[in-house]
């Protein structure tokens, strides 16, 4: 999940209250055989906030008015009252154009805009409105792709010095969070996510040899870290 701070108004006095809306997940899967999925928002703050939600296909700089997506979010903009919640419903309008033999990755954006406090508004204070934008992985999974839990076991690794190619022959996105020898010190410094039926190269802190068996940790649908053993080719 990535967070990006957006600044509104002029920076004269600092009065920011943001990041109070909690989302019920770190990633969202849309099964192809479902009519819709829901995302739960909770506002634990003592004041209401506005929340705007939209999907993008990987361009973090794209604005909602420039994005074409087959998904419909209801409501796209909502007021989330203090100590209350809001349900977002995401429905697929048409699956035309979406791959039927592998997953498609989108990103769910949530922009939280805190309100201006009443006395600040009345006194005409200049206020810094700090809006927090969060992005979550949103994956469309067509029906009939098989068992996602076993996908990481099908990864293959190809070494070239201190570089390692992670080959993903499955129809699923697989997030690799950690690569190590027997669960020891991590060899990778960043998380990678090889797309379905493709490969991605990651730099390692030390070279690995053909025939070695590495521990590969991947993130499952529920955000849990799962380790599998994979031999280097």
How would you describe each model-predicted region?
Residues 94-145, 149, 211-233:
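Terminal connector regions
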Residues 57-67, 176-180:
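Short, basic/aromatic beta-hairpin or loop at an interaction surface
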Residues 13-15:
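N-terminal signal peptide c-region/cleavage motif recognized by signal peptidases
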Residues 1-4:
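Positively charged n-region of N-terminal signal peptides that target proteins for export
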Residues 41-45, 164-170:
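Asparagine-centered strand-capping/turn motif at beta-strand->loop junctions
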Residues 47-55, 167, 174-179:
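Short, hydrophobic/aromatic beta-strand segments
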Residues 18-42, 147-159, 191:
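Beta-sheet-dominated interaction scaffolds and their linkers
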Residues 63-96, 184-211:
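Intrinsically disordered, low-complexity Pro/Gly/Ser/Thr-rich segments with frequent PxxP/GP/PP motifs
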């Amino acid at each position: 999940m990535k967070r990006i701070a957006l600044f509104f108004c002029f920076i004269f006095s600092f009065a920011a209250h943001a990041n109070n809306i909690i989302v019920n997940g770190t990633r969202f899967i849309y099964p192809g055989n479902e009519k819709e999925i829901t995302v739960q928002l909770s506002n634990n703050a003592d004041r209401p906030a506005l929340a705007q939600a939209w999907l993008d296909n990987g361009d973090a700089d794209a604005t909602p008015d420039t994005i074409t997506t087959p998904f419909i979010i209801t409501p796209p903009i909502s007021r989330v009252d203090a100590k209350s919640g809001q349900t977002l419903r995401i429905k697929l309008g048409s699956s035309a154009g979406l791959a039927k033999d592998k997953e498609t990755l989108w990103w769910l954006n949530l922009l939280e805009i805190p309100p201006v406090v009443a006395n600040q508004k009345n006194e005409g204070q200049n206020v810094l409105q700090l809006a927090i934008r969060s992005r979550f992985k949103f994956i469309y999974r067509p029906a009939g792709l098989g068992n996602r839990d076993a996908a990481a076991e099908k990864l293959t690794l190809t070494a070239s010095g201190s570089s390692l190619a992670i080959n993903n022959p499955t129809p699923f996105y697989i997030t690799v969070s950690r690569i190590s020898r027997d669960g020891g010190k991590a060899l990778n410094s960043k998380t990678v996510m090889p797309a379905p039926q493709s490969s991605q190269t990651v730099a390692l802190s030390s070279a690995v040899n053909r025939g070695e068996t590495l521990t590969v940790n991947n993130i499952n649908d529920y955000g849990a870290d799962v380790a599998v053993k994979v031999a280097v080719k």
